[in-house]
């Protein structure tokens, strides 16, 4: 059965230049083969994978601190839904955003104008998840008592032993071992978080984990900042799986980088193909 998938997918593998011994290697070794071929140091990649049908897991550098970027916006949104479910927040009320914290004044000012100074929680959810913008994320955090308070609550969805149990607010570091637990919690409570799933199902069409999977439903939360390019995803292949994939310095990106590195992005996207293809060959038939 594995060989049948290899044969069926051979043309695309060859076209992309991403042919590996998928049916004989572990997931980590497949990823390492890709990194070796393209001269990427193993320390630049961390991932955690979980097959949702079998419960089987795989990982590489999963406790290594990695820059989270905007991936924090997923558990942040989950916290706000929890408060709505408890009856503590309204989905229809519009909240003043003129005085919220922000990262970029131009973005903040544009939101104030666009929404006449106030946003509802559904607006904040959509714009923080579909477009991954910061102003609506700060507005969500304000509903919880501010960003510092929100980060203190991230342990609700999982934690790991070590210096960074969840996501560290100070230097924006996390681990894929933590983030895959967030994805797992989200999927196990998908009815409660159906709005969040809808938005991350709509996010970044044709990009990140969706690039090579146009016919597969993918729920994804990408994160980019400086040297980091990441994506957390729930991939609904025949056998669905979770993947937290974080990277550092791909394509020569540095902590001084202010734009997405094109080569680095291509390398990350190729890695999404490699991971998904390994899954197709080894787990879809399970």
Segment roles from a protein language model:
Residues 39-41, 88-89, 117-121, 212, ...:
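Extracellular/periplasmic catalytic domains that process cell-envelope and extracellular macromolecules
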């Amino acid at each position: 059965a594995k060989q049948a998938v290899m044969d069926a997918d051979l043309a695309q593998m060859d076209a992309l230049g991403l042919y590996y011994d998928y049916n004989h290697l572990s997931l980590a070794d497949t990823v390492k083969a890709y990194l070796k071929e393209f001269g990427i140091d193993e320390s630049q990649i961390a991932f955690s994978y979980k097959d949702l049908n079998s419960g089987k897991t795989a990982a590489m550098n999963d406790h290594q601190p990695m820059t989270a970027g905007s991936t924090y916006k997923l558990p942040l949104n989950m916290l706000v839904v929890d408060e709505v479910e408890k009856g503590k927040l309204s989905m229809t009320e519009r909240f003043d955003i003129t005085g919220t914290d922000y990262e970029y004044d131009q973005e903040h000012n544009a939101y104030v104008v666009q929404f006449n100074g106030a946003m509802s929680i559904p607006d904040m959810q959509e714009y923080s998840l579909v477009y991954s913008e910061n102003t609506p994320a700060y507005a969500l955090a304000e509903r919880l008592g501010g960003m510092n308070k929100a980060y203190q609550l991230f342990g609700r969805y999982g934690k790991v032993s070590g210096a960074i149990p969840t996501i560290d607010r100070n230097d924006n570091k996390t681990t894929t071992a933590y983030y895959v637990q967030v994805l797992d919690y989200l999927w196990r409570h998908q009815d409660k978080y159906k709005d969040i799933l809808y938005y991350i199902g709509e996010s970044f069409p044709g990009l990140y984990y969706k690039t090579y999977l146009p016919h597969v439903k993918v729920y994804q939360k990408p994160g980019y900042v400086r040297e980091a390019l990441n994506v957390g995803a729930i991939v609904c292949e025949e056998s669905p799986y979770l993947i937290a994939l974080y990277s550092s310095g791909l394509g020569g990106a540095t902590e001084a980088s202010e734009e997405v590195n094109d080569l680095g992005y291509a390398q990350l996207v190729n890695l999404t193909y490699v991971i998904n293809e390994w899954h197709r060959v080894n787990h879809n038939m399970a």
